[in-house]
A protein has these predicted regions:
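N-terminal hydrophobic/helix-forming segments and targeting peptides
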Residues: 1-426
Length: 426
């Protein structure tokens, strides 16, 4: 007899997914491969679409954002959408990356997103991303991930800097350049990258390469209630929404799984939530099915989107940073996020819709608002709604140390979101 899938099982699968997703390009490639294995058909934005009833499709943009959708056999009335993002704060490797400085060779990097910089010090790091190369006279894309510790960003010993444990302003160009090797004793960095990608260094025309932490994810705690890992924001939600999307029985609605890039730097890119990617996808698939423009706009107005991006749990050592009343806790359930400043898309209707969905299936929810003297951040829902408006709830899973290189969340919460998304698509 087949054993039921437990929250622990789901978290182990999440850790595996994160380990296989060192860059946004790898995350999208992995999800696309899983969808193709499940019978989805890949379509391209540059081609004319021929969407069929009963079909399952996946399309990518820039190799770092993805839309997947399923079409019912009859009577699609609206779209049911989940949106999450696959990027996380990190360091991007600049062009001409090597800096020889005395006896050492460092890599020239710049910050991507609002990270807790000190958490990147003294960690085993490596490099992942994509290369654009010439291959048989044409441009070709190659993904690369160095499977081994390649770099460390060393901290300064306390004997040399007595202020190291005081609040400190970290400068990327001075403090955060990763150590690559000793002058004259290392293979050039781009030669190592080329060898890993099985191309010649002289054939590399451009690259999108980032650093990633090689510290593995783990499940821990007296009752194995915690999960700690790099990139929980937002691969935890991306994974849970994907699993719910593939599990839910899809009838009546066109079900859409949206995975965006560049949320951590504002989403205002061609592959971000502020782009036309979602709007173009919905309109093109509806028009291909024979819906008029007016019918398509009516479908969108009847639709609903769950924007899933992780939320802040109340901190065990610093509860004063949380709202006095709305204080999510790890393993307390899915967090519904509110903002009077409209940093989140949640309103009374969308909150009630999502609460009822969860209540009907015994899935716990919590509420989050920022401390009134702390403006907080924004996320996908309100940004996407400026391009394609529909009722949207901004939700997330409670976590600690958001934007650290190693974050902590709850084992039960991932399972709660899988369950909620599955029921949403049903």
């Amino acid at each position: 007899m087949k054993q039921p899938i437990t929250a622990d099982d789901i978290s182990r699968d999440l850790i595996h997914f994160i380990a296989k997703s060192p860059s946004t390009f790898h995350a999208v490639r992995g999800i696309k491969a899983a969808l193709l294995y499940a019978g989805f058909t890949e379509i391209r934005e540059e081609d004319t679409w021929q969407i069929e009833k009963g079909g399952k499709y996946v399309v990518t943009r820039n190799g770092s954002a993805l839309m997947a959708f399923t079409v019912p056999q009859e009577g699609a009335e609206a779209f049911h959408i989940t949106a999450s993002h696959c990027d996380s704060p990190t360091f991007k490797i600049k062009e001409n990356p090597e800096i020889a400085d005395g006896p050492y060779v460092k890599l020239n990097v710049e910050g991507y997103g609002g990270m807790i910089m000190s958490t990147w010090l003294d960690r085993p790091l490596s490099v992942a991303g994509r290369l654009l190369v010439t291959e048989n006279g044409h441009l070709a894309e190659k993904l690369v991930a160095i499977d081994g510790t390649m770099l460390v960003i060393p901290s300064v010993a306390i004997h040399m800097d007595r202020s190291v444990n005081q609040h400190k302003e970290w400068k990327v160009q001075k403090d955060m350049l990763p150590l690559y090797g000793m002058t004259g004793a290392k293979t050039p960095f781009m030669d190592v990258i080329a060898a890993a990608a099985k191309v010649k260094a002289e054939d590399i025309l451009a690259h999108d390469l980032i650093l990633y932490s090689r510290v593995p994810g783990t499940i821990w705690g007296e009752e194995r209630e915690f999960i700690s890992s790099p990139k929980l924001d937002d691969l935890q939600c991306a994974f849970a929404c994907f699993r719910g999307f593939t599990q839910g029985q899809k009838e009546k609605y066109i079900s859409v799984y949206a995975l965006f890039d560049n949320e951590e730097v504002g989403s205002a890119t061609s592959q971000g939530a502020g782009s036309t990617f979602l709007a173009n996808t919905l309109e093109r698939l509806a028009r291909s099915l024979g819906y008029s423009y007016d019918e398509t706009m009516a479908m969108i107005a009847r639709s609903f989107m769950i924007s899933a991006d992780n939320a802040h749990s109340v901190h065990p050592n610093h509860p004063e940073y949380a709202d006095p009343v709305n204080r999510p806790v790890i393993n307390g359930g899915i967090v519904i996020k509110y903002s009077a400043a409209q940093k989140y898309a949640t309103n009374a209707f969308s909150a009630a819709y999502f609460k009822k969905l969860c209540k009907d299936h015994d899935i716990p929810t919590q509420t989050f608002t920022n401390h009134s003297d702390n403006p907080g951040g924004s996320t996908l829902g309100n940004i996407s709604n400026t391009v394609i408006a529909m009722p949207t709830v901004d939700i997330g899973l409670p976590q600690l140390a958001m934007h650290s290189s190693y974050e902590t969340a709850g084992v039960k919460d991932t399972a709660y979101l899988v369950d909620a998304v599955t029921k949403f698509y049903e």
